[in-house]
Structure formats: structure tokens, C-alpha cells
């Protein structure tokens, strides 16, 4: 009989949700070949980002995601106290990210989206369907944080200029790009036997085919957005990333977006949100974690 229990303690629900959020960000970063985005091949359309930086940034956010889940467990309901706690924790997480990356914004949009989803999942751990988690996240997003900084982000400025839905509105409407595009395509491609990496690429492309990506609009205007949406649809129409014809179209899209300096960072954040909701829906947080 051993004198000590050498087994690792079971992670708490908050720890497990933070694990899943960070895993989703790393899985998104590693996914290759993504058009004009940082991946295992290179930096895409970015001069200030690389894969190692994306990994370090994701890992730096683990404490913030855990604290968001803990806040949801403590406060127990959708309301202004939780919304403002999430805002404060998110801003602290952003500072930790910037300290890690030397001031480069790697995951600001992801802190917002995944933070809301982590908190929403913690509020009702047994209600794991993607729709129910997204609805709770939307109810949180609709509440006004009195302490949020007033200056508009680049994404918010672009959303106003072009009259499109930004990251804030995407969350407030219950993540339609995730529930209607990313997750259904992920499941379809899996069902067709395309393999997990191809299924994730197809999910990204499905989001890109319809999303008014404010990152693309900021960097390349309406021409860039049109190229992204039409090119992504062409890949899917050719059979997706698992087919030879689809791969050719994907390569063409990559070159076109690189030429336009159009990096679909908004779509990448929503792919990470799709991957997180997929894991929550499968019961990974509840099955491996406990309060």
C-alpha cells in the first residue's frame, strides 16, 4: 500500500473549462493550411505574429478563463454583477496577453467570445447543448458593462462604418456564425469522413463564406471581404478541403488574400468558439471536471 496518493487531483469545472478554451485557441492556431492566417506554415498576412506567439498568448489567458468560470459559479446567474466581473477579468486577461506578446493583439476578440462561452457553460454545467450555452452567453453580452472603456476598438469602428455585425453584436445575437455555419459544417464534414483537420478547415471556410469579418474590412475593405466570402464558398462548392479540387481552390484563396493583405481574424476567433462549443456539447467539461 502506498503512503501517498500520487494521482493528480481531479480538475475543477472552472479549470476544465479554461483548459478547453485554451485548447480551442491552440487548435485554431495549429490548423493548417488556413488562408492568410498564422498557421504551421508561416505568418500568413501578418508581420507581427507567429505560431509560437499565438501559443504563448493562448496559454497566458488560462487564468482569466478560469476566473471567469469561477465568477459564474460563484454568482450563479446572468446579471449585471457577473457581466461586470467578466469585463474586469477580461481586461486583466488582455493585459496579461499584451505583456506576453510584447504589446501585440493576438486574441482580444477571442477573450470576449470564449470568455462569455466559458462563463455561460459554468452557469448551467448540465445544459451543454451549443444553443443553450450560446443563448446564455448572448444574455450576458446584452448587459452593459458600466466600467468598459468608451473608445471603440478597430473592429467596432469598422462595424459602424460598414454597417455590419461586429464581435459585440455576434455575441449579443447568440453567435449565429457559429451555430448556423461553423458547427453544422464541422459535423457535416466529420460525417462525410473527411478527417478532423479537414472538418475544421471546412468549418472555418463556412464561417468565412458569410461573415462580415471586421478584420478583413479593416485591412482590405469591401474588396477583401468579397474575395474572402466568394473564395471560401468556392472551396466548399468544390468539395471542401479534403478534395483535390477543393485544395486547389484553397491555395488560390490563400494567395488572393495574401495579395490583398486580408487576414480573416474574426473568422478564426469564431472557429475557436465553434471548437469550444463542440467540446462543451460533447460533455468534456462535465465528464472530466467537478465543482
Swiss-Prot record:
Provide the species name: Pseudomonas fluorescens (strain ATCC BAA-477 / NRRL B-23932 / Pf-5)
Q: Does the keyword Nucleotide-binding apply?
A: yes
> Which EC number applies?
2.4.2.52
> Keyword set for this entry?
ATP-binding, Nucleotide-binding, Transferase
Lineage, uppermost ranks: Bacteria, Pseudomonadati, Pseudomonadota, Gammaproteobacteria, Pseudomonadales
Query: Is Glycosyltransferase among the key words of this record?
Result: no
Broadest EC class assigned to this enzyme: transferase
Q: What this chain does, per the record?
A: Involved in the formation of 2-(5''-phosphoribosyl)-3'-dephosphocoenzyme-A, the prosthetic group of the acyl-carrier protein of the malonate decarboxylase.
> What's its catalytic activity?
3'-dephospho-CoA + ATP = 2'-(5''-triphospho-alpha-D-ribosyl)-3'-dephospho-CoA + adenine
GO biological processes: prosthetic group biosynthetic process
What family does this belong to? Belongs to the CitG/MdcB family.
- Entry-linked InterPro entries: CitG, TriPribosyl-deP-CoA_syn
Q: Which terms does the record give in the GO molecular function aspect?
A: ATP binding; triphosphoribosyl-dephospho-CoA synthase activity
Protein name (Swiss-Prot/TrEMBL): Probable 2-(5''-triphosphoribosyl)-3'-dephosphocoenzyme-A synthase
Amino acid at each position: 500500500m502506498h503512503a501517498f496518493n500520487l494521482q493528480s487531483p481531479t480538475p475543477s469545472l472552472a479549470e476544465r473549462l479554461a483548459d478547453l478554451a485554451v485548447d480551442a485557441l491552440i487548435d485554431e492556431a495549429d490548423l493548417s493550411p488556413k488562408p492568410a492566417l498564422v498557421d504551421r506554415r508561416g505568418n500568413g498576412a501578418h508581420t507581427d505574429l507567429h505560431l509560437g506567439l499565438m501559443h504563448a498568448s493562448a496559454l497566458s489567458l488560462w487564468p482569466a478563463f478560469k476566473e471567469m468560470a469561477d465568477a459564474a459559479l460563484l454568482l450563479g446567474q446572468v446579471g449585471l454583477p457577473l457581466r461586470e466581473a467578466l469585463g474586469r477579468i477580461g481586461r486583466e486577461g488582455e493585459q496579461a496577453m499584451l505583456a506576453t506578446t510584447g504589446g501585440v493583439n493576438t486574441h482580444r476578440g477571442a477573450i470576449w467570445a470564449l470568455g462569455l462561452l466559458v462563463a455561460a457553460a459554468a452557469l448551467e454545467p448540465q445544459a451543454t447543448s451549443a444553443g443553450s450555452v450560446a443563448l446564455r452567453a448572448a444574455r450576458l453580452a446584452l448587459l452593459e458593462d458600466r466600467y468598459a472603456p468608451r473608445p471603440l476598438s478597430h473592429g467596432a469602428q469598422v462595424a459602424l462604418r460598414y454597417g455590419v455585425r461586429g464581435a459585440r453584436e455576434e455575441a449579443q445575437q447568440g453567435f449565429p456564425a457559429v451555430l448556423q455555419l461553423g458547427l453544422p459544417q464541422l459535423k457535416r464534414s466529420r460525417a462525410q469522413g473527411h478527417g478532423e483537420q479537414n472538418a475544421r478547415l471546412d468549418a472555418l471556410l463556412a464561417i468565412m463564406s458569410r461573415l462580415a469579418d471586421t478584420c478583413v474590412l479593416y485591412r482590405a475593405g469591401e474588396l477583401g471581404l468579397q474575395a474572402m466570402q466568394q473564395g471560401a464558398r468556392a472551396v466548399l462548392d468544390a468539395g471542401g478541403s479534403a478534395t483535390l479540387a477543393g485544395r486547389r481552390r484553397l491555395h488560390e484563396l490563400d494567395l488572393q488574400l495574401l495579395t490583398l493583405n486580408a487576414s480573416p481574424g474574426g473568422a478564426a476567433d469564431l472557429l475557436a468558439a465553434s471548437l469550444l462549443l463542440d467540446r462543451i456539447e460533447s460533455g468534456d467539461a462535465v465528464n472530466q471536471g467537478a465543482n
